[in-house]
C-alpha cells in the first residue's frame, strides 16, 4: 500500500494534482480544496489511498489524515464509489459530513450535490457508528465564509482561522478573528 507520498507539487489538472518524486510524476485524484494553496515547486505531503480495479490502479490523495479516513469510510457504503466520495468531499467539510451522518440528518446530506435521499439514508445506516458529532464554532464558520468571499480558498481560510483560535482561544468577535486571520494570510 502507498500511505503517504512526499514530493514536489507540479500543478493541478482535471481533478488531480501532479506530484514529482525523483523524476517520476504521479497523477493523484483529489478533492477540490486539498492542495489548492500550493504553488508549483512546493514540497508536498499527500495522504493517499491506492484503489486497484480490473482496468486501473488509481491513487486518491488528501491534505489531511482525517479527510483520507473519511474517504475510506465513504467508499465502504454500498453503491458509493470513490468518484462520488471525492465529489462529496469537494462539496462539503468533514465536520459537516460527520455531524449530518452522526445525527441522522437526511436533509443535510441530501443537500450535498450528487447525494439523493436514498444515498443519504444508506450513508446514515451504514456509517452512523463511525462518525461523531463535532462541535462547530459559529464565529469560526462566519470568519471562514468572510475570508472565502475575499478570495481565499476554504483551506487557507480554515487554516488561518484555526491558527488564530488556537493562539487566542478567548476571541469571540468575528471581526477580530478575521483581522488576525488576514495578518496570517498576508504572510503567505
Swiss-Prot record:
Name used for this protein in its record: Holliday junction branch migration complex subunit RuvA
Disulphide bridges, residue numbers: none
Top-rank taxon: Bacteria
Parts of the chain that traverse the membrane: none
Lineage, uppermost ranks: Bacteria, Thermotogati, Thermotogota, Thermotogae, Thermotogales
Quaternary data: Homotetramer. Forms an RuvA(8)-RuvB(12)-Holliday junction (HJ) complex. HJ DNA is sandwiched between 2 RuvA tetramers; dsDNA enters through RuvA and exits via RuvB. An RuvB hexamer assembles on each DNA strand where it exits the tetramer. Each RuvB hexamer is contacted by two RuvA subunits (via domain III) on 2 adjacent RuvB subunits; this complex drives branch migration. In the full resolvosome a probable DNA-RuvA(4)-RuvB(12)-RuvC(2) complex forms which resolves the HJ.
Function (record text): The RuvA-RuvB-RuvC complex processes Holliday junction (HJ) DNA during genetic recombination and DNA repair, while the RuvA-RuvB complex plays an important role in the rescue of blocked DNA replication forks via replication fork reversal (RFR). RuvA specifically binds to HJ cruciform DNA, conferring on it an open structure. The RuvB hexamer acts as an ATP-dependent pump, pulling dsDNA into and through the RuvAB complex. HJ branch migration allows RuvC to scan DNA until it finds its consensus sequence, where it cleaves and resolves the cruciform DNA.
Region (Domain II): 64-142
Region (Flexible linker): 142
Amino acid at each position: 500500500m502507498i500511505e503517504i507520498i512526499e514530493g514536489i507539487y507540479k500543478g493541478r489538472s482535471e481533478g488531480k494534482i501532479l506530484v514529482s518524486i525523483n523524476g517520476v510524476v504521479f497523477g493523484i485524484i483529489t478533492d477540490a480544496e486539498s492542495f489548492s494553496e500550493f504553488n508549483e515547486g512546493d514540497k508536498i505531503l499527500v495522504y493517499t489511498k491506492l484503489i486497484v480495479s480490473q482496468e486501473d490502479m488509481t491513487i486518491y490523495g488528501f491534505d489531511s489524515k482525517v479527510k483520507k479516513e473519511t474517504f475510506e469510510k465513504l467508499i465502504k457504503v454500498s453503491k458509493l464509489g470513490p468518484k462520488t466520495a471525492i465529489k462529496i468531499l469537494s462539496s462539503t467539510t468533514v465536520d459537516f459530513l460527520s455531524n449530518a451522518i452522526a445525527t441522522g440528518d437526511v436533509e443535510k446530506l441530501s443537500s450535498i450535490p450528487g447525494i439523493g435521499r436514498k444515498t443519504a439514508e444508506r450513508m446514515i445506516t451504514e456509517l452512523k457508528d463511525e462518525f461523531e458529532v463535532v462541535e462547530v464554532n459559529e464565529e469560526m464558520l462566519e470568519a471562514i465564509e468572510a475570508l472565502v468571499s475575499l478570495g481565499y480558498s476554504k483551506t487557507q481560510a480554515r487554516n488561518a482561522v484555526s491558527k488564530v483560535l488556537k493562539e487566542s482561544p478567548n476571541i469571540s468577535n468575528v471581526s477580530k478573528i478575521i483581522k488576525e486571520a488576514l495578518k496570517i494570510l498576508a504572510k503567505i
